[in-house]
From Swiss-Prot:
Family designation: Belongs to the bacterial ribosomal protein bL28 family.
Species the sequence originates in: Alkaliphilus metalliredigens (strain QYMF)
HAMAP family linked to this entry: Ribosomal_bL28
Name of the encoding gene: rpmB
Family matches, as NCBIfam families: L28
Any one Gene Ontology BP term: translation
Gene Ontology cellular-component annotations: ribonucleoprotein complex; ribosome
Gene Ontology MF terms in the entry: structural constituent of ribosome
Name this polypeptide is given: Large ribosomal subunit protein bL28
One Pfam short name: Ribosomal_L28
Keywords: Ribonucleoprotein, Ribosomal protein
Length: 63
């Protein structure tokens, strides 16, 4: 799966989009991913990280 966070493994989820008239349509939600350079085991590496992990400080950014 390409749209997965490399830190927390958050990926696509599916469910129903419900209109005002209560009609149901299947849809998917994707995580808000950003490509960042992060320090992994002392070396910089390019990762796909969700914004929740970026904001909570789970990723050490490389400069």
């Amino acid at each position: 799966m390409a749209r997965v966070c490399d830190v927390c493994q958050k990926g696509k989820v599916s469910g129903n989009q419900v209109s005002h008239s209560n009609r149901h349509n299947r849809r998917t939600w994707t995580p808000n991913l950003r490509k960042v350079r992060a320090i992994v085991k002392g070396t910089p590496k390019r990762l796909k990280v969700c914004t929740r992990c970026l904001r909570s400080g789970k990723v050490e950014r490389a400069l």
